[in-house]
Amino acid sequence: MEDAGFVAHYPEEGRWGLGVAAFEVGAAYLRHDPLERLARAPIQRLAAEVAHITPAVALLGVLHGRETLYLLKDAPSTPVTIVAEVGVRLPASLTASGRTLLADLPAAQVRALFPNAASFVDRTGAGPMTLRSLNLLLGEERLRGWAEEDGFISEGVASVAVASHDHDGRPAASVGLTFRSDQADRGARAVLAAAARRCAREITRRLSGSGAGPRA
């Protein structure tokens, strides 16, 4: 049942509980509780891990239609003012957290989510506003291995994000880091993305049931 995603081990709690697959017959929000429980500790560790690079907020997000819904947030001791909060929804086409999940979806599904120009939202004058420009960006980010936005949501604020996957290999949630644009150059952003990727892999491992212990 663990391999199928119906039960999951919560290492920090030292017990077993219902997994993501057990909730798939219900409304989408019912899946969030096991996902949050599995991801909370890795997200907290991620925020601590990158603190020496730059103050960055670690976020866990999921797709909710054309929006990114944020489920977890771990903020650094040095404040970083961002729009994303737990429970907040932002345009998936603009957020790194949303696009890293869109990049793993079939092209037909992305097309269905963004059928026309009215499907796109403009916040700062930056970011994709057509399906063609979105697909070009998704292609670049798919090749790079992470999504990135700079000023698409808030001017002066940037993010990187990587997708984690469920027991069937489908994009389940995004692991993102948000920081001030002027406090992370290209090299630093690559390091942040690598840290987010390690965290996303840990969450994928937990979701897929490929081991019960915490990350070493």
Predicted regions and their residues:
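A short, flexible beta-alpha/helix-coil linker loop
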Residues: 23-25, 119-120, 180-184
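Short helix-to-loop capping/linker segments positioned immediately adjacent to catalytic or ligand/cofactor-binding
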Residues: 45-50, 58, 121-127, 143-150
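Cysteine/selenocysteine-centered motifs that mediate thiol-based redox chemistry or coordinate metal-sulfur cofactors
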Residues: 112-121, 200-216
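Short, acidic, Ser/Thr-enriched surface-loop or helix-capping motifs
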Residues: 11, 63, 166-167
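Amphipathic alpha-helical effector-binding/dimerization core
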Residues: 17-116
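Extended hydrophobic
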Residues: 126-200, 204
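Residue-level recognition of specific faces of alpha-helices
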Residues: 3-6, 21, 59, 156, ...
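N-terminal helix-turn-helix
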Residues: 1-37, 201-209
